[in-house]
Every structure is written in structure tokens, then in C-alpha cells.
Amino acid sequence: MKPTGILFFPAFDWAISPTHPEREERLLYTRDQIFEEGIMDLPQIKEYHPRLAEIRDVARLHFCIPTVEAQIIEAHLVSAGSALVMADAFMQGEVKNAFAIIRPPGHHAMTVSHGNRGFCNINNEAIMIEYLRQKYGIKRVAIVDTDVHHGDGTQEIYWHDPDVLFISFHQDGRTLYPGSGFMEELGGPLAHGTTINLPLAPKTTDAGILYAIDELILPMLEDFKPDIVINSAGQDNHYSDPLANMAFSARGYAELNSRLAPDIAVLEGGYSVETALPYVNMGLIMAMAGIDYSNLREPDYNPSRFKESPRNMEYIKKMVAQQWTAYKNREETIADNRKKSGNFVNYNKSIFYDTEYIYEDQINHLRICQNCGGFRMIESRAHQRTGEHFHVFCISIPANACQQCQEEGRAAYQDMIKKRPFDLLYLQDRVKDDLRIYKVHKDIETVL
Amino acid sequence: MLIGIDVGGTYTDGVLFKQGAIVATVKKPTDDMNLKNTLLEVLDELLPSAGEQKIERIVFSTTLVTNLLATGRGERTALIMLPGHGLPHDAYDICPDIFFARGTVDFRGNVIEKLDQKEIDDILARIAAAGIKRVAVAAKFANRNDIMEREIQSKLAADYPDISVSISSEISNKLNFPRRAATTYFTAMTVKEWMRFAAEINQAITERGLDSEVHILKADGGTFSLDTSSRRPCETVFSGPAASTMGGLALSQPNLNSVVLDIGGTTSDIALIIGGEPLYASKGARLGKHYTHINAFAVNSVALGGDSCLDYDGGIKVQNFRRGAAACFGGDYPTVMDAFNCKMALGIGNAGQSAEKLQQLAAKAGMESSELCRQVVNIVIERLISSIEAMFREWENEPAYKVWEVVNRRKFKLDQIIGIGAAATAIVPQVAARMEVDSFLHDYSPVANALGAAVVRPTLAVELHVDTPNNFFSVGPGGIRGSLNDRGGMQLGEAKNMARQYLLDMCREQGMESYASESSFYMEEQFNIISGWSRSGKIFDVGIQIAPGFISEYKGVSS
């Protein structure tokens, strides 16, 4: 039997600020617990060394404004690079599955990045997925986001991608950051039904979440047949998390992971650094490695303390049924959207970066393609934290784009170089892996 | 004058060393059933060469503990484990007489679940009824709070005074409960036999009228006194490879990146020296299938040596066993040594015999003798190089937990290969040439192991953990615990001073204070503890050591 790959990168020399939840201490007790348990010594585990992601790995996914280097520090490249190490270990058959216990986190980072939102600058999982597609020709991907906060960054990145099934369950956005992830958010016109949100009521327990796993998420994965299953393994649904209000346990997390059986899990949030993380991470490692976790529990765990209310169970059941219908009808809905839309669908979007108080305004243009999910153009403007204002135009040709979308996308880039109404132009051709930045005022094109 | 004796699995080597020169050497077959006799025979053959001069120090390595563990002849010992909540109990498959008890402490030393007195009473009664006279106790996070281990220790002392007990918090202050439990168990089960052996050695030394210091070589390349050794006899495992590595270092230039290649009869041991410091096994010495908290050099053993015999079965094969000595030393079959002897025209022993036996095998294989030699030399060099490079990769791929460590990613840049052992002269220059680095061979290479034993200094590593909000500190080894005088504003500098002071105290106690000034910090960690949204104190982890090195009398060898 192949081992489970673990990359533990606690970034003991990185923090957003000394008392911020994202501080050096965050994975200290997790380290103490997993080292003291000696689980890394077991033959079922293979531990890996991190590496730095390359600038291109980031630029393949994000439009970092003005450059990747300006938006991140080395810690981000190590965190993203660690996910890539796990991806390589899995794809090259060295491990049966892999878990990147890394920070800084990433799932709130969107396609365009002007700064840090929700503790995230760049999206580790999505960078990994585009790397998997580029290097290994992976086509269909499922992401299950089990962080208590809606994975709005990952959702935005794959909103128009019919080959990525993004499922997020989280505490209801009316009660928690980032205030999104409602049931009606089902994906763009050509990828409708491949974004699935399950907003859960505060205090939802193991029973409620495991019901959603069994009755909705597993059947969806069975039906969608992804080439790879990724888990955005946030740990803040835990009953002791200081930033959220759910009632999930360490054993519940282990059980969830064991049923979900992700190929690669990547740590996201989780800020109960002393009373949850050490035990949840142990539980996840044990579940992934197939080690019996029935002897694992938090010091203060009392199974009778958290009982799912019949009323909440009813709510979850109703939600599960409704989302299953949305998912099942997705092909019809998409066909319908193709008929009734014009050549392009255009929409405005405002994005708030809570960590750095940045307001970004976007105009999005999606090509309504008859053969693929269409390419996307984003016009974005924002005052960054430095006070500098950027007005940029970004063209993203997705990995599974058809010939015509590739050609039109590249032509749009050339066209914009002539028209020049922006500070910076970006071309991201994920099919050809061609990544370019055009500085309009200086007339300089950089090929990454 | 200094004496070093390395008891190996097959042979025991001894040297008498004085002012940069080896005065006498002795080589004897090792008698596994009576190591003491082997040791004393070698000692007695060396002593006449000393004449009337005083022997200041005798250091020996021994395979006693290794043999005890391999043959299971240690004392029957019960292991009581308090594993708390985590891995299933069957993950701790350390020994036959194992008992699990309730009682849990967390990583901050908070008691989560108290000891169940009745359960402990029952376990102790069962142990006593089985006639077991020795007990090892290991609790998870006992390095952060040893209260439960101490309670069991007191209970045993009160109720079963004839049962001896070792507790894990005194053995090591490091994280990793299974390693701490295994180390405590192995310590407990070997201590009785070790003390008997140590007493015999002491007596023999006295009988010979010597008043030399007697030290034992440890797996970490340092020594400890015979007295100290009885606290942690397990640390004497794998001292043979440590002796060779330190011997190689003693003979060669310091501060280089080196591979020490010790080529024996049927195995070759590979160790790395990085900037003059030997590389340790990151998970500690491995005894059987268990990792331990015993500091040991990272040694990669390859089943290939000078006496490895050659065969033909459709292709040329270098076997992992011997059928006797090399043909050039009167053996009946061609060996690796013979192939190098002919290929490089080394003229070792009776080279004609090498050529003749190789010719017979070549005829069988239907090839020229020169082609046979070429193939064998290639196989040997490639197998050694791939093992050496695997060690480089392993070192480069050690986990890293800080951004700094990843950004400044290390890469092993080899300067030289140091050859040790009788067959090294033939093989090592060829390996080094293929890797495009220098080879280093010394006239003393064949006895570098015993020389290494003679001249290495004592080592000691002390680890301090401080938790200021909990007003707690612990020091290992020895299981020292205490509270802080001023918990408020403790800074890293004070924690380092504290660790240095404990090292100094232990040095005094072990008669090695002259080395205390050569200590260095190998770990300095500090974390802010946040409660709510404000800082409530700090956690420090500090490690200070007297690293492996050489006694001040040793100023190198005269060439």
C-alpha cells in the first residue's frame, strides 16, 4: 500500500501581524501534537519538503496587479509551492493521497488580486489545479471546500468553468464573512450547476454535515466523475473556533475526510489554535492514511453536548434536495442560456478586500461559446493599499478553451494594445501556457 | 597516552596513541559471547607498548547493547504507557509486556484526565505477579508535565520496592511519545546487564593498576564516562560507525563537506560530514523497527565490500556475501577486491592469484578478463555513488518549517571522499574520480575507527522548554522541572542563559566542565502566546550542546 503524503509547513516565521489569527503560533500546537504522537514516523506516512512555486505558476491563475512580485512575499510562494509538491507526489504515484498542512491560506483570493482578502493573497488550490492541468493534462476537477467561510475566491475563479465542480459548505453568509455562498449562486451561464453552495445554520453539528456529504456531495462526485478530488480543508467548523459558530468535532472532520476520500487536501482556515487544530489535523492525517481514529478526541469533547435539532435537519434535507435538482438540471439550463444570450454576457462586480480595505470595481465579459465555457475579459480598477490606482484589462483563456475562444481571446489582446485605454493589459492563455503583461504607457510587453 | 578500542561485529581494533602518532595497533576477532574478554585481550596487548608511561584515557565502543537488543537477552521489562487520545493502541507495538493506562496531559502540560488509581494498582499487581522486576513508564507529553509518571514511580517505590523503574521524562525532553517510550523501554531492559559489564570493566582496569579515565563511545560520536553510561546505556548503540566517522574526520581536513566511506568485508558504511560536522539521523537511531531519541549519525549501509564475491549467471553479479578472503589474500574465489586489484594494477597481496581466479570466472562468462574487471568496477562504483547521492537527496529533502529554510534551500556540495577500512585504498579513489572530487586516504585509514575512539571528546545536549503563561520550565535529559522566578517579561536571551547554566551544571556533575566553554546553541525558538487578542507570554525552546569534536590533547596526526 502506498503511503499518504504529508507536507507540514507551519511558516513559523510568517504572520499578518503579531496578534492576528494568522500568526506564527497558529500551527505550533499542531506541530507539538503530531510530533508527540509520532505519526510522521509511521510507514503509512511520507513527509515532504516544501518548495517555492514559480511566478508563472501564480500568473497562470491570477492577474496580480501590477505584478506577481508586487502582491506576494516568499511565504506565499512556499505555501503555494507546497501544494504543488503534493500534486507532483500524487500524480507521480509516490503516494495514495496527500495533505498539505500549509499556511498562508488561499481560498478567498480571486482571479484578480489587488491585495489580501480574508487573510489570502493567492489561491493555493487553484494554482495547484491549473498546474495539474498544464503539467499532467488533468481535465475535470472537483473541489470540496470544508472551511466554515464560503470559498468565494475559488468560486469566482471557477464560476465559468463547466469542468470544475466547486462545492462549498459553510456557515450561512448572513452570519459570517465573506457574506456570500447562498444557494442561488450556482455558476455562470455556461457553467451553471457546477458551483454548489450549502449555507448552514450556525451550530450545525457532525450529523448535519455528514448528511450533506452522504446525500449530496458523494452522489454528485459519483455523477460528475472528476479526474481528481481536492479538499479545501479549512478547520473552522470546529465548535471551539473563535471566528465562527459551528459545532463540528475533530472526529467529525476525520469521518468527513474518510467518506470524501479526497486525492489532495489543502489546509485553509481554522483559528482555534490550541483546542481544535492539533486534534483536527491529527484526525485528517489519520483518516487519509487509513489509521483507526476512534481513539481520537479533543480534551473537552462530549458527544452528548452537540445534538442536531430536528428543525435544522429538515432545513439541510430540503437544501440538499434543491441543490441536487439544480445540479441535475445543469445541462438543460446551460443549453437554454446558450440560446438566449448574445455573443457576450457582461456584468459588473464590486469586490471588497477586508484585510487591506481595498474596493475593486470590475466589468466582466464572458464569451458565450457554443463549444466550451468561453473565455473571459475583466476590466478592473482599484486604489491599492499603497495609494496607487490601477486600471487594468485582463484576458483569461481557460485550460479547456476551444480553438475559436483561443483565437478570439488572443485577438482581443492585440486589439487592446492598439486601443490603449488602460494602464496594464494582461493575457493569460492557459492552453498555450502563454502569459503576458503589456505596460501601455511604456509600450513594453513582458512575456512571463 | 591514549587508548582507543572499537569493538566491531567481526573484528575488534585497538590503538595506542601518543602525540600525533599511533604507537601500537591490535586487531582481534570479536567474541560476541564475551565482549569483556575481547576488550581486555586487546587492552593487554596494547599496554606493554606504553611501557611506564601513564595512560590518561581509555575509550571503547561496544556492541553489547546492540547484541542484547538483537538477541532479546535483555531483562524482562514491563512498559506502562499512558497514550491519551490519538493513535490506536496497536500503533505502539514496542514489547510483549505492555500495559495501557488512562491519564492524559496536553501539549501545554494541562492535565486533561487524571490517573485512574485502581487501574494502576491492577496493572502493578499483574506486573508483580508475573515476576517482572523492571518497569518502564511513558506518558504522552510527560516532557511537558511529568506528574503521572512520577505518581506511578512513587507508587512502585512504596508498594513494590524490589521493582526498578525508569520514567520517560527523565530520558528525554523531546517531543515524540513513541520514540520516548521505546528509548525508555530499551534503557530499562539493558541497564542491568550494562551495569554488570561496567563493573567488570572497572574492576579489570583497577586490577591492572591503571588510573585512567574510562569512557564509552556513543552513537552521537562523543563519549561519556563509564559512570554516566549506566544512566543511558542505549546511547552506546551504533558507536562503531560513529568511531569510523570521527576517525575519518580526525585524519582529514576539518570544515569540508565530506563523505566518509568505510569499506569493510561485506558492507560499506556511508556517513556525511557537512562543514566539518557529522550529519545526524533526523529521526534518531532506529532499533529494530522503532525510532528512538538516541542521537546517532546518519549512516547508510550498503551490502557491498572488499570481500563480496563475484558470480556469473547470465550476467556478472556482485554478491552481498563473502565466500572467504579475496583471492589475492589466499581465498578460493574472486572478489571485488581482486577486480580492483587487476583493473588498477594495484599489486595488492598476491596479484597473480587475483588474475587467475578472475580469469576462471571470465572464461565461464565467455568474456575477456579485462572486460569482467571493467564491469565489476563499474557495478561497485555505481552502487556506491547511487547510495551516496541518495543520502545527499535525503538531507536536502528534510522537512522545513520556516520560509527562510525553503528560500535558502540547501544543496550538498561535496569536497572530498574520506576512505576508511582495509579495502578503501583500492576502491575509494575510483569512486572519488567518478564523482570528480578528491579522495582522502591516510596510512592510518585501516585503524581510523580505533583512532576515532581514542581522541573524541565527551558530548552533551541539553534542551530547555519554557512556557511563561504557565510559569513552567523543563530541562532534559534528567527530567528537571520548575517554575520561573519572573514570568512576566522573560526574553529569549534569558532562556538561553538558563539553558547554558543547566548545561554547565551537568558538565560539572559529569566531570566534563573543561568542555563547557565550547558549547553552542543548535535550537532557538520563541512564540508569542495570544489569549483573546492580546499577548499573554511566550514559549521558548532552546537547545545547547557540546558537539562532537576532539579532546584538547589531540592536535592532529603527524603524517
Residue ranges and their predicted role:
Chain B
Residues M1-S559:
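N-terminally biased helix-coil "hinge/interface" segments that flank
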